[in-house]
From Swiss-Prot:
It is found in: Cytoplasm. Homodimer. This is Hypoxanthine/guanine phosphoribosyltransferase. Keywords: Cytoplasm, Glycosyltransferase, Purine salvage, Transferase. GO terms for biological process: IMP salvage; purine ribonucleoside salvage. Its main location: cytoplasm.
Amino acid sequence: MLLEKSLEEAPVVNRNGYWYFIHPITDGVPELPPELLREVAYRIVRALDSTDFDKIVCVEAMGIHLGALLSDMLDRPLVIVRKREYGLDGEVEITQEKGYGVEKLYLNGVSEGDRVVVVDDVISTGGTLVGLINALDDVGAEIEDVVVVVARGGLDRVREETGVDVKYLVRVEVSEDGVSVVESRYR
């Protein structure tokens, strides 16, 4: 599959002792081939328990291309969790704990009773998803599924802190030697 091959060929860089992989799906660099984006979108759809939900929720920035394509494919509205505050009624501030620090995100456009699917590019520590899932719970949304493309870590944390099992297309390990795909799903 293209996703696995492209991950195994992805360059890695060291930032303060942490090995990051650079990939079109997770970084937008280098260019994102349409056939890779299509493959990922179809695999995400296969991962869903049902397509009977109200909205797709994704996180700025690297969840947007995934969410937009899925929104078009499944004819569902797209909600983008943003990194900037708009001050709209009902806006929810989310604390996003990442491997390299803490940031704020802002959720708009989700109401009590909305059935949502959360889509993101990668999970490393689980901090972003824990914050987002808690915010969705706070507004009374029903989380139908949470799917990420690449799982690097954080799956147990999300399950323990929210009770939600995150689905993923591939699980990877990253070191100075590169990216190793250790599990592949929804092919």
